[in-house]
Amino acid sequence: MSQELDYLSQEVALGRGSRRDFLGRAAALGISATAANALLASAAHAAGPRKGGTLKIGLQGGAATDSLDPALAANQLTFHVGRMWGEELVRLTLTGQLRPYLATEWRSSPDAKAWVFKIRKGVQFHNGKEMTPDDVVATMQRHSGPNAKSGALGIMRSVDSVTRDGDSVIFTLKDASADFPFLLTDYHLLIQPNGGNDDPKAAIGTGPYKIVTNEPGVRTIGARFANYWDSKARGHAEQVEITVLNDSTARTAALQSGRVHIINRVDPKVVELIKKAPGVTVQSASGRGHYVFNMFANTAPFNNNDVRMALKLAMDRKDMVDKLLRGFGTIGNDFPINASYPLFTALPQRPYDPDKAAFHYKKSGHTDTILLRTSEVAFPGAVDAAQLYQATCAKAGIKIEVKREPGDGYWSNVWNKQPFSTSFWGGRAVQDQMWATAYITGADWNDTRFFNPAFDKMVVAARGELNQAKRKQIYQDMALIVHNEGGVIVPMFNDTIDAIGPKVGGWIKNPNAELMGGMATAECWLEA
């Protein structure tokens, strides 16, 4: 039986999907009605969400500088906390399709320059106010205004205006965009009362949990919201408590002792050890996530493409993947797209070539030591990765100084601030969203300072191209530009590796992001 049918049967059992749609999809896959109904019955027996208890989660990624303003969410902690209290108009399913959330349906104009979203009625904010299309308009305007500071600013720059039309909201775009609804899955775009303009850090949203305690860098607690609009499908625990456990050993110990029920970012080197703990299950999924070494392409010495090329050629990707990921990932190729994305085209793999790296480095004229900043919060094994890289660079005559930065404050003081550092990306729903978020001029999260007017024009052209073959070619050309000229080194695409204790129910493997694509806080429950 396909993974898709397993997933869809659980969705029906949990009240999040339609039995009719499931049977239709099963028939399309050649599954008999008898077999399909048996699968549904099995899922219904196993599903049965239980209400109550406190679901405890230990996460790497939190810091004292974390904000509850969704516009500023920049790490795993703020992503998962946002999923507790807030919701977007649409979200991704396990199979990469769009699922209605605060919007019930959508349609586009024939030229794909205007998109109309019908807003769900009867949804209440945590402050008792009913959500209206005006709140949606204000939210989108806050993330796209001239003074906006938002991780979604790159994708929102394509929006010319957002207006209300009765029960709907109309997005008028500057250029055609065939994938525009997918962009609205961005986790920064949580709908807030009056768009969050009154108090963006109040964490007042429409999600299943209302924030009752928030100690940045320590813990966040959400209590089940009594008037949540979809309580059958989500919000099963009475409370969800997220504790920041940035140290990998401490996080693992907390799960093994039962102090927490779920942890993220399991280091591949301890997977076999964790599996031996009674009742503990390791959950891994391959997807779009990738680990990166970011160079500011507008800052010396990285503003010289020979330096950038030398540093790319000095990366032994296979060795790094073998030693760090241990089978939980694949080799990267210096652009952020892999086969998980539609319209992907592979490029010839860049080899580890210290001689060629030395050639480009000598050609650049640079001879000084290059400072690389890293931290274990950048990604599991980031410090080890930096040291491996230091050694392979040395073989090309490139001197790298590795500076290990504190985890607390890394995302506010180092990432997107310092010219050479390690980081990670969880990937995005579609190629346009990934490119627009981090690679176009003007994007707040352009963490390689890659500014290329020709590339920017290609992003716009691909966005509006309805001929899939032509669009695929544009994406290939874009990938080649970043591969050869960009400031990003992508050594690997990582699997997400989480671990859950014996009391956790409702877990469904999801490739979109760690912890069930960010849905574990809302959709998991505690078994008796």
Task: Kindly label every feature range from the protein language model.
Residues 1-21:
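N-terminal secretory signal peptides
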